[in-house]
Design a protein with these regions (language model features):
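Positively charged n-region of N-terminal signal peptides that target proteins for export
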Residues: 1-4
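Hydrophobic h-region of N-terminal signal peptides that target proteins for export
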Residues: 10-17
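N-terminal, polar/Ser/Thr-rich
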Residues: 17-58, 85, 129-133, 154
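Hydrophobic helix-coil surface modules that form long, contiguous segments used
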Residues: 59, 153-311, 330
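Surface-exposed beta-strand/loop patches in extracellular or lumenal glycoproteins
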Residues: 60-81, 152, 159-167
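A surface-exposed beta-strand-loop module
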Residues: 78-135, 185-186
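Surface-exposed, acidic/Ser/Thr-rich flexible loop segments
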Residues: 108-171
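Catalytic Zn2+-binding segment of zinc metalloproteases
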Residues: 314-329
Length: 331
């Protein structure tokens, strides 16, 4: 009997230690633990993006949330500890522990009700996909935490507001609508974007760089295409088709689901060398440019693939973005 009591005690201690010392990644245990007492999450993000890709980005995030109890709060940040700057609550620096890619804020700093944690950090370059003239994020399925501290699990949706300081000749796009654009220091400008509706961390995205834009308005909705295409004939040949396919998909899905497009604005970005055919970020779909900018006299299959890709990514705005799976195994 003593033997079994000892084993039971050891298991309890192990579980307790597991909660206090999170392992690498986001375990289902950690995800369920956070989801049970944290809600109403808001990320107010700021990044400064230097034109020289040899210079690191600087970042800051205000994470607002409601806590139903005083408990340790564990954020995900898959970087090294020296990439974390100040951690501030109520105007004061707070002590924290950095464990296996997590930032643990002790429960003594957490209030029942509203909380706000401000963190300064340096993002990892891996998920920023930087080149000399542009960069873009790709955070699926669980890579948001390589760019900024967050609760990186799909069922903890949050509101995102973004501010970017970028070179003055660059353009930028994200999930939310652009609100203001003001000159900053010499050679830079600040773009402030409106807050999104609640979305999962893997769906947050932005792109910035030397892009050109084309906009069209149909059915009282304006779509904007960001691109880097230099072949004017190819651009002219494909542009109207791409807009028609997006508008057609939006209209069909609205009629099919009975739900209007749920995310306000919708832009799409054609990116050279993008890793996937497309990625369905709400408000800012990213595509591999070669899949949509077709050469002269495309085959029937190429046209069908072009239309299928757009329909696929637009359908995700309802199936995946509006209604989202609970866990990573369904991403």
């Amino acid at each position: 009997m003593k033997k079994y009591c000892f084993i039971l005690l050891a298991c309890i201690v192990a579980v307790s230690c597991g909660e206090k010392t999170p392992r690498e990644g986001v375990s289902l245990q950690l995800a369920n633990q956070r989801k049970a007492f944290i809600s109403n999450i808001e990320y107010n993000l700021y990044f400064r993006i230097p034109e020289n890709r040899q210079e690191s980005l600087r970042g800051r995030v205000d994470i607002g949330f409601i806590s139903s109890k005083k408990a340790n709060v564990i954020l995900d940040f898959r970087a090294s500890e020296d990439m974390i700057g100040d951690v501030i609550m109520d105007g004061n620096r707070v002590e924290y522990r950095f464990i296996n890619g997590h930032i643990l804020i002790p429960g003594k700093y957490i209030s029942v009700g509203e909380n706000c944690i401000t963190l300064e950090f340096t993002p990892c370059d891996g998920s920023l996909n930087r080149s000399d003239e542009f960069l873009y994020t790709l955070l699926v399925p669980d890579r948001a935490s390589t760019v900024f501290p967050c609760f990186d699990q799909p069922d903890m949706k949050a509101v995102f507001a973004l501010t970017l300081d970028i070179p003055e000749s660059w353009k930028a796009v994200t999930n939310g609508m652009d609100e203001t654009c003001q000159p900053q220091t010499e050679g830079e400008k600040r773009m402030v974007f409106k807050a999104t509706q609640p979305i999962s961390t893997y769906l947050f995205a932005f792109a910035a760089g030397k892009f050109e834009t084309v906009s069209q308005t149909h059915h009282e909705r304006t779509l904007t295409m960001f691109h880097r295409e230099t072949d004017k004939e190819k651009l002219e040949r494909n542009t109207d088709v791409l807009f028609q396919l997006h508008y057609g998909a939006l209209q069909w899905l609205k009629e099919y689901t009975g739900i209007p497009y749920p995310f306000g604005k919708l832009d799409f970005v054609l990116i050279p060398g993008f890793q996937y055919s497309g990625m369905e970020h709400p408000g800012a779909i990213f595509y591999n440019d070669s899949r949509l900018m077709l050469d002269k006299n495309p085959s029937v299959n190429e046209r069908l693939n072009q239309a299928n890709l757009i329909a696929h990514e637009v359908s995700h705005q309802w199936f995946g973005n509006l209604v989202t799976m609970q866990w990573f195994n369904d991403v």
